[in-house]
């Protein structure tokens, strides 16, 4: 390689994000990188020059194998939104000065869509100033919603977890003979892959969830209530998996019907909360049944 490499982790952790980190470290070292740095808390930490020589903490094969099986993000994470360079070029100048100081030739960033936004901005700015640093995004997201990526590391583990938990919820919901509707809210702003994984609960010993509501399909509250009513004519206990990001035909999030959503994160995304609670309350008001939201 001739130059050093640096790698960071960003966004929410997954069960396998550290396996990707181990892969980057091993690949860079095997291809001649003198030093492979790790950013402590992603780009936010890099701006403060908080980096670590990974060879000092990954000293042998056992360390690397343990890292692959270590949960959460080994290097720490951040949700730092990198501004556009023409709005705040000083941030870019500082970052590239730090990278030059560390003799970086290869920059890896492990994360989801927002992290790919960061790596894209850095690559564009690097091209603008004729930098020879190579910027590479390493896919990571439990949502499985990265463009041109069939399945992202992290989704499989999350999907398996959801399938297991939903089966346990179904078992719990059927212990009483009374009418009961359980609405389970699952992550997924615009992509329904995680919610769809609730279907994995179905097996020879479990009939599975009764309804799955995805953000890709326009949601109608009245139709939803009617479907629940019809289902309860056949069985008392109903379990529903609903994505946090289900939307009405006019584009509004269902959770906005309950309360105005004002809070946003660093990337400007609305804070989605209360979808299951809202739908459980609607069912309770319109049907003679107990409800709960999870």
Question: Locations of the language-model features?
Answer:
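N-terminal phosphate-binding or glycine-rich loops at protein starts, especially the Walker A/P-loop
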Residues: 1-51
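Gly-rich Lys/Arg/Thr-decorated short loops/hinges at beta-loop-alpha junctions or inter-strand turns
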Residues: 3-7, 67-81, 140-150, 177-180, ...
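Short, ordered loop/turn segments at secondary-structure junctions
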Residues: 10-12, 39-45, 79-80, 112-113, ...
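Conserved beta-strand scaffold positions in the cores of enzyme catalytic domains, especially
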Residues: 36, 72-75, 135-137, 183, ...
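Short, well-ordered, mixed-charge alpha-helical segments that flank or form enzyme active sites
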Residues: 47, 84, 115-119, 142-147, ...
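Glycine-rich oxoanion-binding loops at beta->alpha junctions
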Residues: 49-105, 114, 153-156, 160, ...
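Accessory alpha-helical/coil subdomains and C-terminal extensions
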Residues: 98, 106-111, 117-132, 152-292
């Amino acid at each position: 390689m001739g130059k050093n490499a640096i790698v960071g982790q960003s966004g929410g952790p997954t069960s396998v994000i550290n396996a990707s980190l181990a892969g980057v470290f091993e690949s860079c070292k095997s291809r001649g990188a003198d030093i492979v740095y790790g950013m402590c808390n992603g780009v936010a930490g890099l701006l403060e020059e908080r980096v670590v020589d990974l060879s000092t903490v990954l000293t042998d094969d056992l360390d690397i194998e343990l890292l692959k099986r270590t949960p959460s993000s080994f290097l720490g994470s951040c949700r730092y939104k990198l501004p556009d360079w023409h709005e705040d070029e000083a941030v870019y100048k500082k970052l590239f000065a730090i990278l030059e100081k560390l003799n970086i030739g290869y920059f890896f960033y492990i994360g989801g869509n927002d992290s790919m936004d960061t790596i894209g901005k850095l690559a564009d700015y690097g091209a603008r100033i004729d930098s020879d640093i190579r910027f590479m995004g390493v896919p990571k997201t439990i949502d499985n919603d990265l463009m041109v990526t069939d399945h992202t590391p992290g989704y499989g583990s999350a999907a398996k977890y959801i399938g297991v938990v939903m089966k346990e919820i179904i078992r719990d919901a059927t212990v009483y003979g009374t009418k009961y509707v359980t609405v389970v809210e699952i992550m997924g702003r615009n992509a329904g892959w995680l919610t769809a994984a609730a279907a994995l609960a179905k097996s020879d010993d479990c009939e599975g969830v009764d309804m799955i509501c995805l953000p890709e399909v326009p949601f109608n509250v009245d139709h939803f209530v009617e479907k629940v009513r019809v289902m309860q004519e056949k069985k008392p206990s109903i379990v529903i998996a609903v994505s946090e990001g289900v939307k009405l035909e006019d584009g509004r999030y269902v959770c906005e019907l309950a309360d105005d959503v004002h809070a946003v994160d660093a990337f400007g995304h609305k804070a989605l909360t209360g979808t299951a609670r809202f739908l459980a309350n609607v069912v309770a008001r319109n049907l003679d049944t107990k409800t709960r939201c999870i």
